[in-house]
Each structure stands twice: as structure tokens, then as C-alpha cells.
């Protein structure tokens, strides 16, 4: 509920309010509270709580409880910090069920509002909030509830509703008041206005000789309106003539009442611009009709009728219009099945609702009313019924109400909203209802109904007739409840609600509890004994009333904040060590393509050793991290021979994978090419040798070949961007495919000594992938996918330049200790497929010949 409603509750302070010069005692306030509780409504069928906690059974004068919920004839004392409200499905005297441990389980709610099924099994919970020091209402049922006659939101996701002493609750048609022992109940003025018809019907305008109740009734808007009705000061707007079916006819067609309105010399125009007509021959009557039967309405108009002056002029002068039809009667005949009524759906819905004496009607009855009064909809298709449902749901003037308990049928009923009705009555009483703008069809129908009957069926509550069914018992109960000797109701009616959760000043000034003390709080059962209070006799003033202790909610001190920050800083530093420059690792690389390639393969072990730190290091140039694919390269063993080394990607998209890099990526900082040497970038067209282990590369055919660490290099100042991109992509292709150049080609390159680097790939191969079936054949050539072992020094029988082998030995010996995988392969003789087992003599060894241009593989004997 919004905060404005709570502010409105604080406006009515009966303890400090004097009506006239009369002083009110505590007994007067208690009598008003008892009168309000006795005027609360209840379902037709007695609820279980009214039978279980009837006031006849509460004979004790002193009961220890935290709070109480009072209904019209029952009282429930809250003795726990949490109370459930709902409907029990098992009988009241049924035995409790026992679980496997022998402990009795009770799924019963504390306050049973059954047997009406409009109440959910677990509809609401009232619990005490230790943090704020107050009681809260949690609504769980699908049909919701009303707090101080204002509908609230339901569901576990909605915030709870703060309760104060004097709050009125309406759950499933059962109204009750929440009362605290240490504060006088505060009843909102809007609640008194809603209950005023019941109060007047039960206690009359004199308020059962209670001066406070009498003054409250006299100051209410409902009593003032009823007094005007008793004096027959009826305000009406004659929109349609009641005689001759001629509202726009001449004066000869007017009835006696209408002629008296326009021809009477007693007509006068008041200050609001309305004509007032007084018929002296009219005999006052104190009875009013509560039905909307057109035949029951008298053809004679009311004696006092106030209509707009401009409407009178148009009424008298417009005699040229044809006679209007009485649509409510004529269009019901079958011969008018093709005549569509000139009414909106909201108008017909309002007519159907007003046709009920209680102002409440079901959806089926709305259909029945429209089809009975309008032949067009009786013979039309059922599409108009969907429009009726949409208007009921979307129009704020209509609201749903539950059925009575055990009432036949299903579904909710409909009525005109109470707020809309109250707004209309306020305009009606102030004379502003004539300013109805276009489209307000509901207000126009209410205006017509008030003009004929001077009352609305919604002015009575939906269940008021049920309460009035037993007037002697209710009257006797009201007299008994107003006696000062009643000990079940606490004294006082209105006390101003404190702004801080209804807490006394002593509790509001409490110092905050420390964190250590808060952690050592007693269990709720012990605290429950400390904060209990006593509902005592009004004569006994010496009994102390305690209130639940407010426990402030403290936040845990952030004493470990600096320590946590230091730990996090050290953890981040461990994850991000200083980056190692690639150019420093490759500082001694000579300017030769193959030597750079083999050195890069050897240096892959260095990179792999520092991969735990380098994979999370940031780029010094741009500060950004690059996503690089996993690369499989060949490294050198201690003898300088090529040995395959396979690495995989770490899977982290923000880190550098643990790979060995090739020539193009390591030596690209000082690499510059020009257009005339583009032909040297192409690989030889002759077939080159590839072994089984070289072919077994899981990354072969990867789509990430165009990605390279060279993308973040800012030192390359070559203006020819095409050559740079060509170099990067070709170098990456070399990485992925693991191509090995022929030794004869490399020797011819060294003899020329033209200081040009060669990347063994072609521009044609950059965009053309080899057949996937070829690589699958090579990858799965071995059953266990294990590398072949050699007993000799040269494990693969490659013809490598001695100078190159010497330079490779220098780099390979520095990583001898860290290369455990190479040592394992040297000491093991793995018997796998014939393609991998190439040890011993190479005379009978078979090699694979791969032609990249023709995508062919052939096996030859050495």
C-alpha cells in the first residue's frame, strides 16, 4: 500500500479531536472501536475462525499475546511471531499426521477463513520483522486482499505491507481489525466512510447514545446525503421524457410533471445556473426504490428537479425533431433483430449491473441481460461476447468481486468500482456531474439511474443484506459490545501513529547494538517470553504492556577489506608477470629462412616453459590480448635432429596459447619485403617429402590460419600493406601445415646469399585448403596415434645442412633439461604403424609424396 494511505490514516486522531465543545472519555473511544468492529462484514456461511475463536469462548479477562485480530463476532490472539491465514482442507477435529520419526506434522493454518474457496490454502502470513520492529502482512493468495479497503498486490515478489494498530484487513470477504496492546487503534477516515452505512443501520443517526460516535456519523458525507434524501431534495437530470416517448416534442406532448417544470411561475435560477422547480402539491415520501424496473418508476416526475438552464432552452425550442424511440423496450422485439442498438458495450454492461438490486452480476447474467433487451445481439454471432469481456477487463469502472460461500456457479462477479462510484457521487452532490465529457458512458448511466431512483445499488455493500438478515441478534450484540464493562477490547480509539514504525520513544533512542552483541542474541523462544504483553481489564492500570523489541540490522564491519585487496593484487600479479619480448628470444637468429624456422622450433620449448605467465601477459604496444590458434611445430633434440612437438590451445579467449612460433612470427620485426621478390615467397612446385608424424597434426586445416601475433606489431613500417598481410598469412599457413622444405632447395638459397627470407607457401595455397579426406587418412594412419620411435640419430631421415644442424645444436643443448618429452622418445622404442616405425635402415623405408597442386599422395621406396 502506498505511503499516502498511511498518511491519510494519521489524519484521524480521535484522542485529540473535539467535535464542538464536547470532551470524550476513554470509554467513548472504546465504544467507537467496538462499534466499528461489530459493523465489519463476514461471509454468509459462518467461517471456521468464527466458530473456533468465537467471542463467547473468550471469557478470560487477561490474555498474554503480542497482538490480536478482531472480527465481528470472533477474536484471535496472536501468540507467535508468525501467523498464517488461509483455508484448511481437513476437518477441524482431525488427528495430526505423524512422519517417519514419530513427530506430528501439522499443515493447518492458524486462522481458517474457510470453507469459501475464494481463500487460498495459504493465503497470507502476518509476521514480526525484527529489523524494523513492526508487524508485516505478506499476501500469497491469488485473489489478494484489501488493506484499509485498498486492494494490494499479491505474490512473493511484492513487498510486504506494514501493519499498525487499527488496520482493517479484508481477505476473502472476511473483514478484521489488527490491534496492538500498547497503542490505541487508528482507523483511517476512508474506512469509516466505507463502514458508515452499516454504522447508521445498526446504531442510527444518534450513535447509540455515544457522543463521539454520534458526532462522527453526523460529520460523514453519507449521513449528509441521507439527510438531503429525507428532505426530498432530489437532484435529477431529465435526459429522456417519461411521457409520450417525446423527449424533444412540443409542450403539448409533455406530461404534467414536465409542464410544471417549464410553466410553473415558481421556477427560479440558482447561482449554479440550474432551474429549480417546487411542486407544493407533492406529498413527501421517505421510501426510495432500490430496483431499476422501468415499469415501477412513476410517470410523475419528482417535486424538486434541478436541470441545466441551457438544456431547458433546447428542450422547449426543439420541437422539429421526430419522436425518439424507447430503445430499452422496443429493441427487444424480434422484428428489430437488424437494428443495432446505439449504445456502447460499456453502456450495456452498466445497464446490466444496475439491473441487479445488489449491483453485482455475473458474466453469464450480463450476456443474458443484453440478449434479452436487444434482439440484435440475441440473433447475432457470439463475437460480441468477447467484446464484453474485453470491456470488463480494460475499463477501470468495473471490478471483480468473489461469490458468496457455497454459491452455485463459478467465476467472479462484476460490479461498478467503489472508487468510481464514490467519485461520481461526489460530483453529483456538488452539482458538477452535468459536465460529463464524451465517452463517459458509465457515468451517464449512473446519472440516469440516480435521476429515477436517487440511489445506487452499490451504496450498500455486496454482503450488507446478509448482515441485515439477523437484525435482533446484531443489535443485541452491538449494545453489549458498547458497554464499558467489556474487557476484551482495549481502551482508546485513535492515537497518532509514530513515524518510526510505531515504536515508543524509549526504543527509538536506543543506542545501536554492537556486532558482537548481536551475534549473541537469545533464541526466538527466549525473546518471545520477554516481549509478551497482557491484554488487561480497562480498570486495571497497573499492568505493564511490553512490545516486541526492535533489533536493528547492522552491517558486518569491513575489517578485512585491505587484506582482501592485497591478496587480490598479489594474485593478479602472479597471473600477469612481466612480458618477455619475442625479439630478445630470437636475437641470435641468422638471416636465413630455414635457420630461423628451426631456431623457432627450438625456441618453442622456451615459450612453452614460460607459457604459464606469458599466456596471461598483456601486449606492451596496444595493451590488448590476442586470440591465437594452437600451433604444432617441430623442435630439435640434443643431437640436432628434428623432433615433433605438439601443443594445444588453452581454450581461454583472452590469453595467448602455449605454442611454439615459426619464422614469420618471430622474425617479422625486422622483415621487409618489396614487390620484385614476391616470387620467392612461393613454395617449390616440385613434390616435397612429408613423413607420417609430420602429417599427424590435429591443427591441420584449421580456419584460424590468418591470425598471427604480427597483427599487433607497430614497428613494421613497410608501406606495401599487401605484402605485409601476405607474409603474415603465409607464415601462419606454414605454422599450421608444418611443411618441411627440401634440403636441396635450402642449399641453393644459402649459396645465393641474397639476404632474402623465404616463407615456404604460395599465394594460391593461402586460399585453398587441402582435401579433408587426405588429412583424415594421415591423422588416423596409426591405431594409437603414437609417434614413431627411432633407434638411430636421425629419427626421421631428413637431409639437413650440417651448418644448420650445428646452429640447431646450440639452441637445443640449452633446453636439454627442460625437454623431457624428447628424452622419453629417445629411450623408448614404440612399435606402431609401419608409417611411423622408420628406425633402423632406411633402405626399405617408405615415404609419402604430397603434391599440393594436385592434392595427391603417393608412397615411394627410398
Swiss-Prot record:
Compositionally skewed regions (Basic and acidic residues) per UniProt: 804-829
Disruption phenotype: Causes only a modest decline in CLB2 cluster genes expression, but this expression is abolished when both FKH1 and FKH2 are deleted. Leads to a defect in silencing HMRa. Causes a form of yeast pseudohyphal growth, when FKH2 is also deleted. Affects cell-cycle progression and CLB2 mRNA expression.
Entry keyword annotation includes 4Fe-4S: no
Chain intervals for the UniProt region annotation (Disordered): 498-528, 611-663, 698-730, 750-846
Domains as described in the record: The FHA domain is necessary for the interaction with NDD1.
Miscellaneous comment: Present with 656 molecules/cell in log phase SD medium.
PANTHER family: CHECKPOINT SUPPRESSOR 1-LIKE, ISOFORM A-RELATED, FORK HEAD PROTEIN HOMOLOG 2
Official protein name in the record: Fork head protein homolog 2
Species name: Saccharomyces cerevisiae (strain ATCC 204508 / S288c) (Baker's yeast)
Lineage of producing organism: Eukaryota, Fungi, Dikarya, Ascomycota, Saccharomycotina
